Amino acid sequence: MACIDNAMRALFLLALFCVVHGEKAKSKDNDAKASGPGGSFDITKLGASGNGKTDSTKAVQEAWASACGGTGKQTILIPKGDFLVGPLNFTGPCKGDVTIQVNGNLLATTDLSQYKDHGNWIEILRVDNLVITGKGKLDGQGPAVWSKNSCVKKYDCKILPNSLVMDFVNNGEVSGITLLNSKFFHMNMYKCKDMLIKDVNVTAPGDSPNTDGIHMGDSSGVTITNTVIGVGDDCISIGPGTSKVNITGVTCGPGHGISIGSLGRYKDEKDVTDINVKDCTLKKTANGVRIKAYEDAASVLTASKIHYENIKMEDSGYPIIIDMKYCPNKLCTANGASKVTVKDVTFKNITGTSSTPEAVNLLCTAKIPCTGVTMDDVNIKYSGTNNKTMAVCKNAKGSAKGCLKELACF
């Protein structure tokens, strides 16, 4: 019996040894499998290479699958290095809260055949409580493909991949990172709610096509703060159906300014309301703070309760502009009147210099005038010497006080 007991004990110890070491090996070989609440997934331990040449798409996708499938707080680590990846799809809902820690750089493939029609580079869908943070970069490598952009020439065009797209994301945060040289828009939010964008840098050449910095549509509760944006299109663009937006401490330039719109291009667009832009600086931008609606608008909608305050212009073109006959590159299909209503807009303490004589442009339509426009302490001077500072105001109704006399439209 003793022999049997000793043999059983030996077998038990051997089995235990195998189980323990087997689990260690399994854990070492596959760090992507979460074993309980909380977890961290380093993409280099899943096969990613930081040499900037090896395709690391599979490793990043595996890290997402494991982090999204784990409970508690999960972290995907992008360590220092340059990681080449193709299109990434991060789909929820997730069982826990996921943080993507970007310490290194993700480089987008320049092979457009890898992107499906109207595809994006990094697309995040139906994920709540997402955090993307770090000091690394999301590099769209746009210079390699910008020449293939046809949207600057024709109305109906094939869109190049956006860099970071978040759809149906609630209570999300993007902080600290740099978005660089997107092929199209750098960041695009659609039907998102309660989003915080802070301490972000967005960078592309001033002549890069359609490289909007941050765009949002059909979203609410978006805050953008302490962010520097220099791009080839709008620094920030607020699309239809958006409300409760707060933009503070943003430096914009180069770029086309901070815009609401374009509005009315597509059918069934929804209203824009409760937009606040405060304590921002615009440097050598093509436009300043702008509201724009297509002159051949397909939708009837209203933009209202819009407040601009403490905005400094540094040699920006058209610092204040409401354009209800917007028609980029003269590609509109008809010379019609916009169906968009603009009302209850305040410009308060807007100062600095303009690169164009027209420091204020309120270009509304006779059929639907702009109403409730308040200009309070607007003091912008033309920086040139060949003309004088002026305002161009058509079909706009409101009040002005404390403004440079040349800019008081009312």
Swiss-Prot record:
Annotated signal peptide: 1-22
Q: Which domain of life is it from?
A: Eukaryota
- Localization in the cell: Secreted; Secreted, Cell wall
Positions bearing carbohydrate? 89, 201, 246, 349, 387
Q: One cellular component GO annotation, for this chain's record?
A: extracellular region
The cross-references to Gene3D superfamilies, in alphabetical order and at most eight, read: Single-stranded right-handed beta-helix, Pectin lyase-like
Question: Its catalytic activity?
Answer: [(1->4)-alpha-D-galacturonosyl](n) + H2O = alpha-D-galacturonate + [(1->4)-alpha-D-galacturonosyl](n-1)
Primary location group:
secreted
Q: List the disulfide bonds.
A: 235-252, 364-370, 393-409
Q: Does this UniProt record's set of keywords contain S-adenosyl-L-methionine?
A: no
Q: Where is the active site?
A: 233 (proton donor), 256
Supply the alphabetized keyword list: Cell wall, Cell wall biogenesis/degradation, Disulfide bond, Glycoprotein, Glycosidase, Hydrolase, Repeat, Secreted, Signal
* GO BP, one annotated term: carbohydrate metabolic process
From the UniProt record, list the PbH1 repeat ranges. 192-218, 219-240, 242-262, 272-293, 337-377
**Primary role:** May function in depolymerizing pectin during pollen development, germination, and tube growth. Acts as an exo-polygalacturonase.
Family named by the database record:
Belongs to the glycosyl hydrolase 28 family.
Name listed for the protein in its UniProt record? Exopolygalacturonase
- Organism for this UniProt entry: Zea mays
